[in-house]
UniProtKB/Swiss-Prot annotation:
Protein name in UniProt: NADPH-dependent 7-cyano-7-deazaguanine reductase
Record family assignment: Belongs to the GTP cyclohydrolase I family. QueF type 2 subfamily.
Enzyme Commission number(s) of this protein: 1.7.1.13
Lineage of the organism: Bacteria, Pseudomonadati, Pseudomonadota, Betaproteobacteria, Burkholderiales
Main location: cytoplasm
GO biological process, one term: queuosine biosynthetic process
Record's function text: Catalyzes the NADPH-dependent reduction of 7-cyano-7-deazaguanine (preQ0) to 7-aminomethyl-7-deazaguanine (preQ1).
Binding site for substrate: 81-83, 227-228
Catalytic reactions on record: 7-aminomethyl-7-carbaguanine + 2 NADP(+) = 7-cyano-7-deazaguanine + 2 NADPH + 3 H(+)
Length: 281
């Protein structure tokens, strides 16, 4: 079984410049999900929205081509792809000739689909779109909508996940609201390098205590976990401790190595967020 410790994270790596799908390193979701009480089917829907800003290949005449790639990985996949391996994989396109942008897109879709669905009884596919330079100026920047939790003047003393900080007012009328914080920080599971993000929490149900929620989000500050795992932990902690009727947790992390990863988890099926970067990304 692939584990994060066996990946290229934190290790010196040779950069292949000829296409090599074997560089992709899938990691099972199940182990980390078991830590947060998920055994079998996950109690949420959603996807991991990836943006790759450093993608280049050669056309058949050897001229370099560039694009921005948007990749959508359903959260039902049994694996994630370790991000450094994905960077190395994309770099392997650099000196490889392809007939068209469509061929590159199809190759990425097939390779990533095989990696994340590996071993699944009913494998599916991932979504891949490539944005070419003539469309770059149509890539918007937009901050997450919602009431900013960071306005609250709270004392923060916990820097490992502390779900006991979460509470909801079940003796009051239910509400529907969207809350946002830009203070999310965690660390890479393997290297300990900081990961910075913004998080949006939309829910219906008993009103969540906002001060406690902000303190809870800050408590991830020294926690070592991948982006996808942090968002699933946040979702499960709010779901079990605050017991909302509906819940969506969406985080956008700043890029590293030309990649950003933006997980979305929802209690009910809904249309995926458009993959729009924030100013910090």
């Amino acid at each position: 079984m692939n584990t994060p410790e066996h990946s290229q994270l934190g290790k010196a790596s040779a950069y292949a410049d000829q296409y090599d799908a074997s560089l992709l390193f899938p990691i099972p979701r199940a182990d980390k999900r078991a830590e947060i009480g998920i055994d079998g089917n996950a109690p949420f829907f959603g996807a991991d929205l990836w943006t790759a800003f450093e993608l280049s290949w050669l056309n058949l005449r050897g001229k370099p081509q560039v694009a921005i790639a948007h990749i959508t990985v359903p959260c039902e996949t049994p694996h994630i792809v370790e991000s450094k391996s994905f960077k190395l994989y994309l770099n392997s396109f650099n000196n490889t000739r392809f007939a068209s942008e469509a061929e590159v897109r199809a190759r990425i879709r097939a390779d990533v689909s095989e990696a994340v669905w590996r071993g699944a009884e009913h494998p599916g596919t991932v979504g891949v779109t490539l944005l070419l330079p003539e469309a770059f100026d149509r890539e918007p920047i937009h901050e997450l909508d919602g009431l900013l939790l960071d306005r609250l003047d709270v004392e923060c003393t916990r820097y490992q996940p502390a779900p006991e900080l979460l509470a909801a007012h079940h003796d009051e009328a239910p509400v529907t609201e969207t809350l946002v914080s830009h203070l999310l920080k965690s660390n890479c599971l393997v290297t300990g390098q900081p990961d910075w993000g913004s998080v949006q929490i939309t829910y219906s149900g008993a009103q969540i205590d906002q001060a406690g929620l902000l303190q809870y989000l800050v408590s991830f500050r020294n926690h070592n976990e991948f982006h996808e795992q942090c968002v699933e932990r946040i979702f499960m902690d709010i779901w079990t401790r605050c017991r909302p009727i509906k819940l969506a947790v969406y985080a956008r992390y700043t890029r590293r190595g030309g990649l950003d990863i933006n997980p979305l988890r929802t209690s009910h099926p809904q249309q995926l967020q458009r993959n729009v970067r924030t100013a910090r990304q």
